[in-house]
Regions:
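A secondary-structure micro-motif
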Residues: 18-196
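Interfacial residues of coiled-coil/leucine-zipper alpha-helices
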Residues: 2, 6-9, 16, 23
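An alpha-helix initiation/capping motif
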Residues: 10-13, 33
């Protein structure tokens, strides 16, 4: 029927757009090997925490590899099976998770470092920041590579605003994610070309 055809067409157009973004992403990440995959499961009760993709160890996916959708990082592989992998999203509220170490260039030319956390209603921010006030709105935030879990230079998002934490000791820098966290259907798992 016509309604089903229109719905399917709309779904295919959205997937096509995401595939085009994945191709664009591949051109910019020349220092990495990219494993493209599709999201096959995302439960309502863990919507902001986890999703399952259709690529696993057979495709070369390993634990802790970063995952991108659209133009930015959306999470990290936390569990790998032969044909599927579980991805923990950067919006997870799990306090025990490994956080992404990030950096941004301040107006004074220095690097500002922090760790990705979730503040408020699924809003990502980088916290434990000393010089956050020197970051302008729109400044790009990238993975720093510190801690060794993620390669350096993958886009997380852009600075939305900076505030002081409740103790007045450090800054909380809210980030507008570059990645498609709402409803990704196509993802790119990022693998270093030269694996240690």
């Amino acid at each position: 029927n016509l309604a089903q055809t229109k719905a399917r067409n709309s779904s295919l157009e959205a997937e096509n757009t995401q595939l085009k973004q994945a191709l664009k992403l591949k051109k910019t990440l020349t220092d990495y090997t990219i494993i493209n995959g599709s999201v096959i499961s995302r439960a309502a009760d863990t919507w902001s925490d986890l999703l399952i993709i259709d690529q696993g160890s057979r495709a070369g996916v390993k634990k802790n590899m970063p995952v991108m959708a659209g133009k930015g990082v959306i999470g990290r592989v936390v569990e790998v099976n032969s044909t599927t992998s579980k991805v923990e999203l950067i919006t997870t509220t799990d306090k025990s998770t490994n956080k992404f170490a990030v950096e941004a260039d301040a107006a004074n030319g220095k690097k500002v470092h922090g760790v990705i956390s979730v503040v408020g209603n699924n809003q990502i921010a980088f916290t434990q920041v000393v010089d956050g006030q020197k970051l302008k709105k729109g400044t790009r935030v990238y993975t720093s590579g510190m801690g060794g879990l993620s390669p350096k230079g993958l886009l997380i998002g852009t600075v939305k605003k900076t505030t002081r934490d409740t103790f007045g000791l450090s800054d909380v820098v809210e980030i507008q994610p570059a990645g498609n966290l709402n409803d990704p259907s196509v993802v790119s798992v990022i693998k270093r070309k030269v694996e240690e």
